[in-house]
Curated annotation (Swiss-Prot):
The keyword Transferase applies. InterPro entries: Aminotrans_V_dom, PyrdxlP-dep_Trfase, PyrdxlP-dep_Trfase_major, PyrdxlP-dep_Trfase_small, SP_NH2Trfase/AEP_transaminase. Keywords: Aminotransferase, Pyridoxal phosphate, Transferase. It comes from the Bacteria. This is Uncharacterized aminotransferase HP_0736. Its EC number is 2.6.1.-. Pfam families: Aminotran_5.
Length: 369
């Protein structure tokens, strides 16, 4: 089965071998050296002053960021299930929250965000997804973060980059907390997340002492000494060590970002050549999302007959979307096969006659022929 879901993504053989080595104990000097190396690489990757690793899914890092940085009121963008989650986190902690709702295919607008901020001076934290993976939407987080800081530099900008980190370069100058997750571009199993922090965020965290398991003040103190407050994500840390080696072998992150972008744009072209519609108005490079009334039938046929698994949508688009992953290191031939299978499935359902245009378009675009 070829797994093309946007998380958990397929784990290649090189990454799987990182889990097969003998288990080290996390309170040893040997593991501390690996932990230190991984954190230093993550700092370089994100461009932020500190990076904390957490033994949790990405939702844990979202919660940790909100409770650590928001003292008064929160503003969040809801353009899908993951944006909505920021509001649920705020409610669980009795934090007053202001919600900006957008259609799942529509990116957030800078002027609307600034309008809410100006009307509510108690807002001291803002949350948004870089990529809202419910629909594969890319928000203009860089422009939004800059505009917020120019309007009120005291507002902390929290960006869920779980499906953007490791996919494309992110401008983080005006970002205070950047959140990542193991099961996306890092090609690891779920259950590890990270929070990269600006200097302003570090100072806020050191002033406060909130949470227990997700107490970032405690984690900051311990991880600066190459250990963790509680049990470390040991195998995930070893996996990250291997991930950085693989990226280096590719030529570094610039090379990885180029390959991911080429695959994403080539897939978009192939999808359009099939007469299909791309769902978001501003597509992310992490996935290609198709909206189609036959989405459920196509996904089922692809899985059963062609051994290709794409993801569907979430309510209310559960049976209307097909999401094709581009995160991680994916061989070109696998992407080409998956798109060819999609065209064959369209033919099988009498929706379009097969003529090989998907594969041809993808390869021409990818190789610049």
């Amino acid at each position: 089965m070829l797994l093309f879901t946007p998380g958990p993504v397929a784990i290649n053989e090189e990454m799987r071998t990182s889990f097969s080595q003998p288990m080290p104990h996390h309170r040893t000097k040997d593991f501390e050296k690996i932990f230190q190396s991984v954190r230093e690489n993550l700092k370089k990757m994100t461009g932020l002053e500190e990076v904390l690793l957490l033994s949790s899914s990405g939702t844990g890092a979202m919660e940790a960021s909100v409770i650590s940085l928001c003292q008064k009121e929160l503003l969040f963008v809801n353009a899908g299930k993951f944006g909505e989650r920021f509001g649920k986190i705020a409610k669980a902690h009795s934090i007053k929250a202001h919600e900006l709702v957008y259609e799942w295919d529509t990116p957030a607008q800078v002027d609307e965000i600034l309008s809410v901020l100006k009307a509510n001076p108690n807002i001291d934290a803002f949350c948004i997804q870089a990529c809202e993976s419910s629909g594969g939407l890319r928000h203009p987080v860089e422009k939004i973060a800059q505009a917020i800081k120019e309007t009120n530099p005291n507002v902390f900008v929290i960006v869920d980059a779980i499906t953007a980190l490791g996919v494309e370069p992110l401008e983080i100058t005006h970002v205070d907390a950047l959140i990542g997750g193991s099961q996306k571009a890092f090609m690891l199993p779920p259950a590890m997340s990270l929070v990269a922090l600006s200097q302003n965020a570090i100072e806020r965290i050191e002033e406060r002492n909130v949470g227990f398991y997700f107490n970032l003040k405690s984690e900051l103190k311990n991880q600066r000494n190459n250990t963790t407050s509680y049990t470390a994500p040991i195998l995930h840390t070893l996996g990250l060590q291997r991930y950085f080696e693989l990226v280096q072998n590719l030529g570094g992150f610039e090379a990885l970002y180029r390959e991911t972008k080429k695959a994403a744009l080539a897939t978009q072209k192939a999808v359009l050549a099939l007469g299909l519609k791309i769902f978001p108005k501003s597509p992310s490079l992490s996935m290609t999302t198709i909206v189609n009334e036959h989405a459920k039938e196509l996904r089922n046929l692809l899985k059963e007959k062609y051994q290709v698994q794409f993801a569907g949508g979430q309510e209310p688009y559960k049976d209307a979307l097909i999401r094709i992953n581009h995160m991680g290191i994916i061989p070109v031939y696998k992407s080409a096969y998956a798109l060819n299978a999609l065209e064959l499935a369209l033919n099988d359902l009498d929706l379009r006659e097969f003529d090989g245009v998907a594969n041809a378009t993808f390869l021409k675009q990818y190789y610049g022929i």
